[in-house]
């Protein structure tokens, strides 16, 4: 033995295994840049294709106007012919269903929603004609499919994970509420789409604004200045794009303005927090009094201009409802505002009339659903039901049922609501920016309706904030999944729980899909879906 040599007494280090076998396999599968690019784009494309199949399959069934299609499809058809919504004879639906689609009148129809959503429906009518029920619904189906792609890309930006993005898109693709609202030609799917597009623009603006604010402050401090308030950032193209998107949402339904207001407030808060992180003393005052007015001017006027543009057909024609109101004796404004052109006086009167209609709407309806019960999924909307006889519509032995019920996948919905409630707690504890942004989407789509619990409203309005519920659920799934650096036990458990949840959600969607797509089923099978008495 060499003098002075020492013998190590340190034993082998017991290193706990990390990750899972699935992680190892996935790592080998994506071991090349080409494969990673394929997953990066292929995953979102695959869930979008799945969404397209579920929304387009047998889209023309039933060949009958469903629920509020009686208003919006016929309005869209007259928009194509007149540029404004015109009236129809009473009880005209049977004729329209039978292909006699040109019985409309030249008299204007009183409509209480802006025209944009109906113009979108009209695109399908223009391509396929009004005698083809596929043409009635194709625009809405395409919009619903594109919404899945947008949500997937938004989720990847939020969570920096293609896996979580694909999970979010998959849940949106297979959810029944999203499927039904993409398979009927009504307005709310378009409202959801444009609001989600605005959300995506707000997300992009958040990073754009933060980077430029930091650069401007660094430049000021490098020059020896000591700014207390910080600069105003005027060039914010993503914010302008958000204004366009929210204006388009409002051009479908006025509730699009809820998203404009909610995210307008959100932008002030985000700017204040960004200035505080950058060490500005007057961060709150600067956000409200300095950047706030600039943000308002970049967002709100843009939205209003886009909203007004959605009424172009009404402005450029002469026969729209109330189009010539101000020109009738005794109606024109007098005094301070007498200079306002008559067309604008008529327009403002029409908008006031629409507002009065909505706030006073309290007519009973069998599927009216109080907003207080929306999150519990108490009263979903039955949009269409038929009992075909033996030998008709694929019924092998009566009694049979065909239904279009706008009900979410119950597992996905209730899990998403629970996740959103957890995110409220998490926001209080952690202040994560992703959590705040997601909850603002939920709040903008849901909370304003709590002011109107006495009005006639419906569960299907929740499509407007469904994407944000799904983002909340995806956020929680990400927490359950954990990271590759977690212990093997924790990581394997997280993967297993997530896999079981996704499999159960898929099975339930397969179970419910016939009732989302007007597929003929035995009456006993339809009855199996009445989990609550209020679901009938």
Residue ranges, per PLM feature:
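Start-transfer (signal-anchor) and selected internal transmembrane alpha helices
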Residues: 1-54, 290-303, 492-498
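Membrane-interface transmembrane helices that cradle and orient dolichyl/undecaprenyl
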Residues: 16, 22-25, 158-159, 198-238, ...
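Aromatic-rich transmembrane-lumenal/periplasmic boundary elements in polytopic membrane proteins
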Residues: 58-97, 284-287, 294-295, 303-379, ...
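Transmembrane-helix motifs of polytopic, lipid-linked glycan transferases
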Residues: 138-159, 197, 419-423
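Short helix- or helix-capping micro-motifs
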Residues: 51, 168-173, 180, 246, ...
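Short acidic/glycine- and proline-prone juxtamembrane loop motifs at membrane-interface regions
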Residues: 65-66, 136, 140, 180-190, ...
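Transmembrane helical bundles and short interhelical boundary loops of multi-pass, membrane-embedded
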Residues: 2-9, 230-241, 246, 271-275, ...
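Transmembrane-helix signature of polytopic, membrane-embedded enzymes
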Residues: 46-47, 151-174, 211-217, 231-232, ...
């Amino acid at each position: 033995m060499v003098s002075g040599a020492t013998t190590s007494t340190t034993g082998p280090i017991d290193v706990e295994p990390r990750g899972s076998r699935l992680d190892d396999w996935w790592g080998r599968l994506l071991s090349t840049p080409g494969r990673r690019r394929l997953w990066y784009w292929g995953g979102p494309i695959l869930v979008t294709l799945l969404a397209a199949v579920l929304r387009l399959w047998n889209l023309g069934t039933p060949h009958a106007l469903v629920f509020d299609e009686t208003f919006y499809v016929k309005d869209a058809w007259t928009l194509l012919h007149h540029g404004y919504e015109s009236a129809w004879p009473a009880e005209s639906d049977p004729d329209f269903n039978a292909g006699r689609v040109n019985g409309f009148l030249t008299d204007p129809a009183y409509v209480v929603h802006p025209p944009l959503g109906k113009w979108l429906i009209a695109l399908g009518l223009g391509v396929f004609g009004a005698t083809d029920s596929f043409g009635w619904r194709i625009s809405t189906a395409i919009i619903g499919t594109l919404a899945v792609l947008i949500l997937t890309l938004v989720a990847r930006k939020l969570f920096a994970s293609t896996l979580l993005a694909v999970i979010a898109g998959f849940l949106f693709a297979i959810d029944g509420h999203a499927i039904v609202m993409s398979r009927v030609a009504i307005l709310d799917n378009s409202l959801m789409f444009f609001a989600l597009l605005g959300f995506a623009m707000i997300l992009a603006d958040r990073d754009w604004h933060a980077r430029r604010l930091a650069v401007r402050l660094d430049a000021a401090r490098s020059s020896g200045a000591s700014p207390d308030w910080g600069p105003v950032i005027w060039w914010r193209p993503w914010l302008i794009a958000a204004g366009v998107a929210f204006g388009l949402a409002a051009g479908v339904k006025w509730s699009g303005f809820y998203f404009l207001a909610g995210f307008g407030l959100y932008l002030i808060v985000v700017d204040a927090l960004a200035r505080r992180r950058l060490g500005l003393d007057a961060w709150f005052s600067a956000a409200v009094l300095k950047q706030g007015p600039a943000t308002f001017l970049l967002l709100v006027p843009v939205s209003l201009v886009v909203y007004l543009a959605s009424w172009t057909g009404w402005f450029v024609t002469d026969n729209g409802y109330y189009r010539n109101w101000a020109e009738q004796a005794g109606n024109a404004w007098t005094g301070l505002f007498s200079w306002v052109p008559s067309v604008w006086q008529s327009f403002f009167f029409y908008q006031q009339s629409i507002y009065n209609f909505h706030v006073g709407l309290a007519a009973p309806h069998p599927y009216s659903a109080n907003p207080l019960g929306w999150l519990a999924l108490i009263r979903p909307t039955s949009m269409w039901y038929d009992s075909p006889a033996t030998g008709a519509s694929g019924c092998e032995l009566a009694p049979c049922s065909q239904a279009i019920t706008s009900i979410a996948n119950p597992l996905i919905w209730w899990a998403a609501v629970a996740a959103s409630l957890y995110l409220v707690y998490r926001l209080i504890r952690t202040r994560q920016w992703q959590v705040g942004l997601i909850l603002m989407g939920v709040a903008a789509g849901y909370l304003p309706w709590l002011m109107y619990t006495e009005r006639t409203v419906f569960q299907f309005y929740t499509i407007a904030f469904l994407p944000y519920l799904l983002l909340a659920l995806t956020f929680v799934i990400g927490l359950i999944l954990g990271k590759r650096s977690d212990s093997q036990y924790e990581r394997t458990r997280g993967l297993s729980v997530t896999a079981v949840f996704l499999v159960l959600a898929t099975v339930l969607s397969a179970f419910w899909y016939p009732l989302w797509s007007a597929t003929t089923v035995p009456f006993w099978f339809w009855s199996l879906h009445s989990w609550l008495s209020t679901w009938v």
